[in-house]
Amino acid sequence: LAEYYLSKKHKVSGCDNLIGGTLDNIDVNKINFFKADCENLDEMTKIIKDVDVVVHTAAYPHEGLSSFSPYLICKSNYIGSISVFTAAIQNNVKRVVFCSSMARYGDIETPFFEEQKVRPVDPYGVSKLAAENTLKILADTHDIEYNIAVPHNIIGPKQKYDDPYRNVVSIMTNLILQNRRPIIYGDGEQTRSFSDIDDCIFCLDKLITDKNINKETFNIGPDEENITINELYKILCNKLKYNEPAVYVKDRPNEVKHAICSANKARKYLDYKTSVTLDESIQKVIDFIKSKGAKKFTYNYRLEINNENTPETWKKKVF
C-alpha cells in the first residue's frame, strides 16, 4: 500500500515495531518511517501530525494463538487500535481506515456478509470487533470519516514466512524448502479463501480516497476460489516437487472450519474484481521465499496459557 501511494506521488509515513516484518520490505529513503509500537499513545500522537488519512493495518494477527496468549494479542489489537484512533482524532485527521479481520464473523453460516450478526469465537476476533465498534463511537463523537476493511487471508511477497503461528502458505513453503514435512491441523478439510495483496490495494484506495464512501464496512478479497488445506498442500507439493505426506495433528481449539466471505458489496461499490488467480498468488509467495532463502522459525510470542489444550506444535516448538 505504501509503495502504491509513493507511485502516485503522495507523501507516505509508516510506523511498525518490526515484530512482524523487516526493514528490507521498505525503502526508508522514500518513506518517513518510525519504529514504534502503536500501543504508545504519546508516540502515536507525535507521529500522526500533519497527516490527512491514517490507515491502521497494524496487529498481532494470530487468531489461533489468541486463545493461549490472550493478554498479549488483545492488548496489541485493541489498546493499540484505540491509541491510533485517539492520536488521529487529536491531530484532526480527516479519515481513518481500519483493517479488521474476518475473524470478526466467527463460526456462522458462510459466505460471510457484512450485515450479518457476528459471533467471534476467539479473543483475536473479539478484539478486532471491539476496535471496530470503538472507532464508530469515536468517529461519530468527534465527526471524522472512517471506513472498515475486512480482508481475508491476504498472501503475497514480503509476508513474514518464519512465523510458526500464521500464514499457512508461507509456513508450508518454508518447511518444504527445508525438506521438512508440513503439519496440518485436524483433517485438512477446512475451507479458506486467499486474497492476493495486489487485488486488495485498489479496494483499500477507494476506502481511503473516495469521499462518497464513508462509515462503511467491506469484505476485501475473492469468493470464487475456495480451497481446502489439503488441496492447498497438494498445489504446493506439485509446485515444489515434494512427495512426502503432511503430518496430521489434533485440531486447534476454536478454529473455524469454513471461513468464506462474500465479495458482493465490494464488487458493487468498490469495483472489486479478482485479477490474480490463487495459483499465481501461491507462485509469487514461493518465488519470494526462494529468493530470500528458507529460514528457521522464530517464536516471538510467549504462551501465556500452557496446558493440555495448547497445541503440542507450539509447546514443543516443532516448527
Where are these regions (language model features)?
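Non-catalytic, hydrophobic alpha-helical segments
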Residues: 54, 200, 204, 220, ...
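N-terminal Rossmann-like NAD(P)+-binding domain of SDR-like oxidoreductases, especially those catalyzing
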Residues: 1-151, 309, 319
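Amphipathic terminal alpha-helices
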Residues: 278-319
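Hydrophobic alpha-helix immediately C-terminal to the catalytic Tyr-X-X-X-Lys motif of short-chain
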Residues: 130, 134, 138, 168, ...
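C-terminal "lid/loop" region of Rossmann-like NAD(P)-dependent oxidoreductases
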Residues: 187, 215-219, 230-233, 241-258, ...
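Glycine/proline-rich active-site loop of Rossmann-fold NAD(P)-dependent oxidoreductases
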Residues: 129, 142, 154-170, 180-181, ...
